[in-house]
From Swiss-Prot:
It comes from Kluyveromyces lactis (strain ATCC 8585 / CBS 2359 / DSM 70799 / NBRC 1267 / NRRL Y-1140 / WM37). Residues 531-569, 799-843 are annotated as: Disordered. SMART domains: DEXDc (SM00487), HELICc (SM00490). ATP-dependent DNA helicase involved in DNA damage repair by homologous recombination and in genome maintenance. Capable of unwinding D-loops. Plays a role in limiting crossover recombinants during mitotic DNA double-strand break (DSB) repair. Component of a FANCM-MHF complex which promotes gene conversion at blocked replication forks, probably by reversal of the stalled fork. ATP binds at I121, P122, T123, G124, T125, G126, K127, T128. Interacts with the MHF histone-fold complex to form the FANCM-MHF complex. This is ATP-dependent DNA helicase MPH1. A motif (DEAH box) lies at residues 223-226. Residues 108-275 form the Helicase ATP-binding domain. InterPro entries: DEAD/DEAH_box_helicase_dom, FANCM/Mph1-like_ID, FANCM_DEXDc, Helicase_ATP-bd, Helicase_C-like, P-loop_NTPase.
């Protein structure tokens, strides 16, 4: 029995928690810190449920069993938006009545104003009108926020420009079109305009360059939203904006969201959709506005020539298939059931399997490669006909036999197939049949021609027809078969993409490149001369063939099939199709979406696919403004695949309507207390905006709108061009890096992001407070043990004894060899007061020559003290301590002659900083610095011993005129390791003008 345990709530941290405790955060929580949750708060409630487990006889749970499972519930809430709202317009939203008010459009618009909506409605039912209405209202509701419409192609962008500007009346002065690759004035355009029509790639690039601030976006419209999968620009665009802005509206438009439920869920997740508005042609609120579409499905059998070829190929490939089945690399089937896609998948699995020996791996690969080629032959035979098969087979046959004859290939399996006598006989028959001018390589061609002839006989003169096929070879064959009818009423043309057609295997070129090359200069020259001659001959033949094609009616289609159609050629063909110069367009997949082809009355699908999206897009090209007809030609198992795909799509639509998807909650943007009411209003369009509705060509629409936005519609007098100057070009602005709110910029050390804990005696975790900066608590004291030491010899007077330093401590003076009281103890800290300085009141006796006695005797000098070092309280050794400081002889000598019992010389000067000056004599000072450097790598405290001949302590005077010699050991300085770690390096010290004095005193 399931038991519900007490649940716990976990709140995802906000951005301002970046400096908080990070030790207990999960990966998801850390990732959420990197996102800018501007006004979004996410709470996760985790509920644990017990699950039944197995127990032993003693009722103990058996090992390796899970005793519970967790159920996570996420609650998302939003705060006020960061956009500046126009309060006076929030009470209402405008619904244009310039066109007929349709209930489904009305409902979708109201929903899209307050939620992120995926609008999936049939082609031609007004998706652009819905987008324009939503754009209009957010233009009114906000003061300066950006509204962006994105589409993958220029024609789709042009359609939206016409719909938006021609319906909503948004002024040109606030709109911009960004389609070209030029980045000139792009930053100024983003700053000055509010409504943008562009492609997702342009927006993505400008966001990454820092030209567009993602926080300014309040509405993003995405057309053809079914592309928002994988790494497409739509996905990257929304990801980038979500990092900085969660308070924006997203409207996605498409006719088919995806082919399966997993694909729809991916689109929903990538675009953060909170609701799907789905309509079909059979929906009650849409059916009344749909034009009638008569759909006819025709099953066509195979001609005898095709059946014979299928049978003979099966006989030739049977031994190879049987071997593959025995090896276990292909499932058992009949030869005519070989599938190219299945064979290709199996070959990829074998290549990626490291456990198979290399020799066996490549043997199996070549077998499956041959089966895949045979699968392509079968598909071309059944769906496209004898000509498509013959061209493919002849290319593969020529390539293999050439390489095999030159011993560049040793594939005996493929050799047995291609050199099969039965196959050679069949190919010869195919060649003879294809040379007959009126021979139809597939029965589909005959049905297609009959359908076109009947349609244009009865249809009006302005009728148009489109034929869809996947292969370019098939498209050209269809154009030629229509041309053979010699019917003036049928004027076909091919319509394909920009890519060049695949070149067939050139036997002559391959042989010439792989034959033995002479090593002599003469042989090399002959080879180069021969290559040039062959290239010139090929060039001449191509020019001759092109000249011959221009004399035929299908010449332009043949040329397009070889070299592809660039955008200029595509535009011209579409323009001629709209004008009626061509009334039959034979398209590949390029004509399925993204092009404004115009009104079409007849659609013929020469082949079909297993993708419902492609099938729906093809059929959606007709029946937009008037009734249309759809003819589907099937052969082989095409009908089964088509019906299965459409049934799966219907099941998908049912699953979507029954809430089988997980949605993301979106920000309402408007305040909760604002409930705008609908105002149906007829919008008066300005003459400039209305002019765009009269344009048909997409490029003309874009050109006109661009000129209007730039204010160049009215003719102006041409101003004389300014003379060229040598002035430097204006420097481009620096790239802007947009950051989420409340983010600490700059570099942060890793130690500052960590919290340290300690465990007390009770086992409790106690947080340690962060260490205080040394610089912050460092007392500003001066320990000037050595003042103005510039010379390392006591026999030479300092050359710079008169340096004026206002902050310089009191210097010791002597009068006939007698030290004054303050000279001796002013700088010495008292043992009773730690680091504070106290002046001793005892008198000082006149020192005897060669022996300088200091008569100060109170308290036991061995008493140890603690003094504040600037960072922490550390114990210091007394004068009599022998913990690796001074030898016994040095201690006795030091205490006897120089140190009174009240004085403690364990002074650790702060070496954290020193002034930058210059030392003229460095030999002895370098020796001291080497000692400091040795201390840096040691864990203990060491003694820096300094001989009296190298430096004078402040407490000891020196009278050069007396000429006395001091044979004493100067006091040693105890320097803790902590104070040395931040000391200046030797190079800085050697450049110190005032020498070691400031190094020890600062």
């Amino acid at each position: 029995m399931f038991c519900k345990q007490k649940h716990k709530t976990r709140k995802k941290p906000a951005v301002n928690a970046l400096m908080a405790d990070l030790s207990d955060l999960s990966d998801d929580d850390l990732e959420s810190l990197l996102e800018n949750n501007v006004n979004r708060s996410v709470n996760q409630t985790v509920t644990r449920h017990r699950i039944p487990v197995q127990r032993d006889l003693f009722m103990n749970v058996l090992p390796n069993q899970q005793t519970f499972y967790e159920e996570t519930h996420t609650d998302v809430s939003y705060g006020p938006t960061h956009h500046q709202l126009n309060e006076e317009n929030l009470d209402e939203y405008i619904y244009p009545t310039n066109y007929e008010v349709r209930q489904y459009q009305y409902d979708i618009v109201r929903c899209a104003l307050f939620e992120n909506v995926l609008c999936a409605i049939p082609t031609g039912t007004g998706k652009t009108f819905i987008a324009s209405t939503v754009m209009l209202n957010y233009y009114r509701w906000t003061k300066s926020s950006k509204i962006i419409f994105t589409a993958p192609t220029r024609p789709l962008v042009a359609q939206q420009i016409k719909a938006c500007l021609g319906i909503t009346g948004i002024p040109y002065s606030d709109t911009a079109i960004l389609l070209d690759k030029s980045r000139k004035n792009r930053e100024e355009i983003w700053q000055q305009k509010r409504v943008f029509f562009t492609t997702p790639q342009v927006v993505e690039n400008d966001l990454k360059r820092g030209v567009l601030n993602p926080k300014d976006v309040v509405l993003l419209v995405i057309d053809e939203a079914h592309r928002a999968r994988g790494n497409y620009a739509y996905v990257e665009l929304t990801k980038f904006i979500d990092r900085f802005n969660t308070s924006y509206r997203l409207l996605a438009l498409t006719a088919t969201p995806a082919a399966d439920l997993e694909g729809v869920q991916e689109v929903v997740n990538n675009l953060h959709i909170s609701k799907i508005e789905l309509r079909t042609e059979d929906s009650l609120d849409v059916a009344r506005y749909m034009m009638r579409r008569d759909r006819e499905m025709i099953e066509i059998g195979l001609i005898p020539e095709i059946e014979e070829v299928v049978e003979q190929i099966g006989i030739a490939i049977a031994p190879v298939l049987q071997e593959a089945i025995q090896l276990g690399i292909y499932e058992s089937c009949e030869p005519h059931q070989i599938n190219a896609f299945v064979a290709m998948q199996q070959s990829q699995k074998i290549i990626l399997n490291p456990s198979i020996p290399e020799g066996l791996k490549w043997k199996n690969f070549f077998i499956l490669q041959l089966l895949s080629q045979v699968g392509h032959m079968y598909r071309r035979l059944r769906i496209y006909g004898l000509r498509a098969f013959y061209n493919y087979f002849q290319n593969k046959y020529t390539e293999f036999t050439t390489k095999y004859s030159m011993k560049k290939s040793t594939n005996k399996t493929a050799a047995n197939f291609f050199y099969s006598p039965i196959l050679k006989t069949v190919i010869d028959k195919c060649k003879r049949r294809l040379e007959e001018p009126e021979f139809y390589s597939h029965e589909k061609l005959e049905y297609l021609n009959n359908e076109l002839a009947d349609f244009f006989t009865m249809a009006p003169s302005d009728s148009r027809a489109i034929i869809f096929t996947e292969l370019r070879e098939s498209a050209l064959e269809i154009v030629k078969s229509i041309d053979i009818l010699n019917d003036g009423a049928l004027r076909p043309h091919i319509f394909i993409g920009q890519a060049k057609g695949k070149e067939h295997f050139d036997e002559e070129t391959y042989i010439r490149k792989n034959k033995p090359k002479g090593r002599t200069k003469a042989a090399r020259l002959r080879r180069i001369e021969e290559e040039n001659r062959v290239e010139e001959e090929k060039k001449r033949q191509k020019e001759q063939a092109k000249l011959e094609r221009t004399g035929r009616r299908t010449g332009s289609s043949e040329e397009a099939q070889l070299s592809g159609m660039n955008q200029k050629q595509q535009k011209k063909v579409i323009s001629d199709f709209k004008k009626g110069i061509y009334n039959v367009l034979v398209c590949t997949s390029i004509g399925e979406e993204g092009l404004d082809i115009g009104e079409v009355d007849l659609i013929i699908c020469f082949d079909s696919t297993s993708s419902p999206i492609k099938n729906i897009q093809r059929m959606g090209r007709t029946g937009r403004k008037r009734d249309g007809r759809i003819v589907l030609l099937f052969s082989g198992n095409e009908k089964f695949k088509f019906e299965q795909a459409m049934n799966d799509y219907e099941n998908l639509q049912t699953a979507i309507t029954h809430n089988a998807l997980e949605y993301t909650k979106s920000d309402r943007i408007l305040p909760p207390n604002v409930q705008p009411k609908c105002e149906e209003k007829f919008i008066i369009i300005s003459n400039e905006n209305d002019e765009v509705n009269k344009l048909e060509d997409s490029d003309e629409v874009i050109k006109y709108a661009t000129q209007a936005m730039l204010g160049k519609l009215k003719t102006k007098k041409k101003e004389p061009k300014p003379k060229k100057t040598t002035a430097k070009a204006k420097k481009s602005s620096d790239k802007t890096f947009f950051m989420p709110d409340n983010v600490k910029e700059g570099f942060t050390s890793a130690s500052s992001l960590l919290n340290k804990y300690t465990i007390n005696e009770f086992g409790e975790k106690i947080s340690l407070t962060p260490s205080v900066s040394k610089k912050a608590i460092k007392p500003k004291k001066e320990w000037n043990m050595l003042d103005e030491i510039e010379y390392d010899s006591v026999e030479i007077s300092p050359a710079k004894s008169q340096v004026e330093q206002p902050s310089q401590p009191h210097k010791p003076t002597t009068t006939q060899g007698i030290l004054t009281p303050d000279e001796t103890t002013n700088h010495i800290p008292s043992a009773s007061q730690g680091s504070s300085v106290q002046t001793d009141s005892h008198t000082v006796q006149e020192p005897v020559l060669k022996k300088l006695k200091l008569a100060h005797q109170i308290e036991d000098p061995s008493t140890s003290i603690e003094y504040y070092s600037g960072y922490e309280l550390v114990p210091q050794y007394g004068a009599t301590d022998s913990a690796q400081m001074l030898t016994m002889q040095e201690q006795r000598h030091f205490l006897k002659k120089y140190v009174p019992d009240t004085v403690h010389w364990s002074i650790a000067p702060d070496l954290a900083k020193s002034k930058t000056r210059k030392i003229r004599h460095v030999p002895k000072i370098e020796e001291i610095l080497n000692t400091c450097q040795d201390m840096h790598t040691n864990t203990r405290e060491k003694i820096i011993g300094m001989n009296r001949t190298n430096a004078l302590a402040r407490s000891i005077g020196y009278n050069r005129s007396v000429g006395m010699e001091l044979e004493v050991m100067l006091p040693s300085i105890v320097v803790p390791n902590e104070t040395i770690t931040n000391a200046k390096n030797m190079t800085d010290l050697l450049e110190d003008e005032d020498g070691l004095s400031d190094f020890l005193s600062d």
